[in-house]
UniProtKB/Swiss-Prot annotation:
InterPro entries: HAMP_dom (IPR003660), HATPase_C_sf (IPR036890), His_kinase_dom (IPR005467), HisK_dim/P_dom (IPR003661), HisK_dim/P_sf (IPR036097), MtrAB_MtrB (IPR047669), Sig_transdc_His_kin-like_C (IPR004358). It comes from the Bacteria. The keyword Membrane applies. Its EC number is 2.7.13.3. It comes from Mycobacterium tuberculosis (strain CDC 1551 / Oshkosh). Residues 1-15 have a biased composition (Basic residues). This is Sensor histidine kinase MtrB. The gene is mtrB. NCBIfam families: MtrAB_MtrB. The chain crosses the membrane at residues 42-62, 213-233. Residues 529-551 have a biased composition (Pro residues). GO terms for cellular component: plasma membrane. It is an enzyme of class 2 (transferase). The lineage of its organism: Bacteria, Bacillati, Actinomycetota, Actinomycetes, Mycobacteriales.
Amino acid sequence: MIFGSRRRIRGRRGRSGPMTRGLSALSRAVAVAWRRSLQLRVVALTLGLSLAVILALGFVLTSQVTNRVLDIKVRAAIDQIERARTTVSGIVNGEETRSLDSSLQLARNTLTSKTDPASGAGLAGAFDAVLMVPGDGPRAASTAGPVDQVPNALRGFVKAGQAAYQYATVQTEGFSGPALIIGTPTLSRVANLELYLIFPLASEQATITLVRGTMATGGLVLLVLLAGIALLVSRQVVVPVRSASRIAERFAEGHLSERMPVRGEDDMARLAVSFNDMAESLSRQIAQLEEFGNLQRRFTSDVSHELRTPLTTVRMAADLIYDHSADLDPTLRRSTELMVSELDRFETLLNDLLEISRHDAGVAELSVEAVDLRTTVNNALGNVGHLAEEAGIELLVDLPAEQVIAEVDARRVERILRNLIANAIDHAEHKPVRIRMAADEDTVAVTVRDYGVGLRPGEEKLVFSRFWRSDPSRVRRSGGTGLGLAISVEDARLHQGRLEAWGEPGEGACFRLTLPLVRGHKVTTSPLPMKPIPQPVLQPVAQPNPQPMPPEYKERQRPREHAEWSG
């Protein structure tokens, strides 16, 4: 029995589960609609307040009507029982030859016959009469009519010589339901004769029910009308607000010619005028900023192109002098080396400015091919590895054992990695720099982690700004121009990828490049975490398959590097 009871309990829980979930979902949907819809809140509050007022008024009016109907009934019943008492006294005091029971029955029949509408009697309506003489000692009580329907409390008042009335539910041969029972003692030769009249309240109850139904129907119709009125009134406010919201969204999307329609001279019209004035002012400012931006980009592009021709001439002359520097005295030889070095930096700056101008103008294009990104990482390490060797910084490389094929512009991705590794070397403080790669089904990520000075709060975004430097006094070992990370983040966006930064003061920094494996796909997640998991960082064996930079990287270095990377 216990087990059966448990099974039944589990069954009830199982059946109530979907209903509970459905109610929960419905409540959440209603809550969302309540928060998001001003019109719904206005209509609901209007209906709620109107319902409260209608209920209060309905209760008051129903009470007033009920009391009025019953008061009329009571007054008519009092008049009726006064006449009935006179009639009973005349019959009982008439012939002495009749027995008491016969006299009581005759009086009852006479009273009930007067309720016939054709006789013009019965002002309070139809009624039934009860006559009773209580028993005294051995003498039994004499009654006429349904004496058992008279409440004992009412009989107590009448025995005390008082006229009284009471509402009660009765069941007689001709009527069953609520009734008004009124009683009074009579003045006759028969001592303690009591007279009671039972007035059914069927007609009064029907009248009150009709009034209540009419008021309920009227209240329901009034609620519907109020809901429609509230809906129309709130619509006059909500529609312009929604229109302003839609126009503001389109304005934010770049449709600067969008304006709100102005109708009339009310508050909404003034709101539309103010909104249009604001939109016009913003449009002018945006147009001015676009014009200034175009002028700036055109100036940068023109200056870069104009400087390239004389720079090429100077470069040829400098290379010629540098090739014969062995024939010069030491002072001139040193000057020649400095000139060539600064020309390298100047040429890199011009290349970066041209690249930035192409990104700003929106003409930068990808030369996509399917490549193994491990090779791209190795090429980047080969170009900047000598910087780590000169600074005494160990490069720890962790690459997958399998190929990582991605559809990318290998030149741009390699430039991103060169910039990230060179930037890490500049800020590593003679501590190792770790390069990791991982891939999943859709994306590939490369992180470059250093354990140097790190980044202060808020610098994760500033680090990608043009010419921004966290510490202007720090010397760049890589000789960068300050545009490398700005170009890198644009190259990442061109691939529909992400370039992100994290850092803490004294803990170092981590830059993460995430790219889609297939061109056109968007990056939603990254296979590598941004914030590194705490672990020993000074030991190369702390990561699986860590390895220093291979020796062949050193053989690939040239005396003078003309790569496109910058710090």
